Amino acid sequence: MNVAIVKYNAGNIYSVIHALKRLGITPTLTDDAELLAKADKVLFPGQGEASTAMAYLRQHDLDRVIPELRQPVLGICIGQQLMCRHSQEGDTDCLGIFPLDVKRFQPQQHTDKVPQMGWNSIHDLKSPLFKGIGDGEFIYNVHSFYVPHHEDYTIATCDYILPYSAALNRDNFFATQFHPEKSGGVGEKILRNFLEL
């Protein structure tokens, strides 16, 4: 299987590469449009700042290439946020794959910490991406921004300060706010499910 990872100026790419290697897949890290289009599956992971990431994507024409991909695509963390329409982070226009806006967590009480860092549970699982995953399983998060729940696109929810979209799906595009590559056996199962789509 030919698996590509979108290369751009975002951290945490190599933990995804290592997670895929544990599943027997050696992915290609690339920002080449032709290689991305030819891949069987594409992953779009990363951690970083939205406006900086979008500037790189535009500079390399990836803002056009990614939304036109026809194979299964999985965005992870900032990858999910960049697949949305707009992010409050840097007042950034994003790829628009999901017609949703990314918002910053607003602490409601003094015990609320931003960013969310650590383990939390996912619920309301509605996709083959979560085949064999039980409601309430724990996944690993590091993020200050979130996508609100949307009836048409949310395929998993999480609750931190408020309920939000832990995962999204539209056609061939999937995305998780959490890090499957850092979520132990549950995350490995989610990645395997994606590869089997």
Where do the PLM segments sit?
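Extreme N-terminal starter segment of soluble prokaryotic enzymes
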Residues: 1-4
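An anion/phosphate-binding loop that grips the pyrophosphate of nucleotide cofactors and donors
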Residues: 39
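Structural motif
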Residues: 43-45
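Cysteine-nucleophile active-site neighborhood
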Residues: 48-116
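Pocket-forming structural segment of enzyme catalytic cores
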Residues: 85-162
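Beta-strand-turn-beta hairpins that frame and shape the catalytic cleft
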Residues: 136, 169-174
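Short, surface-exposed beta-strand/loop micro-motifs that present aromatic residues
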Residues: 162-169
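Acyltransferase
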Residues: 176-197
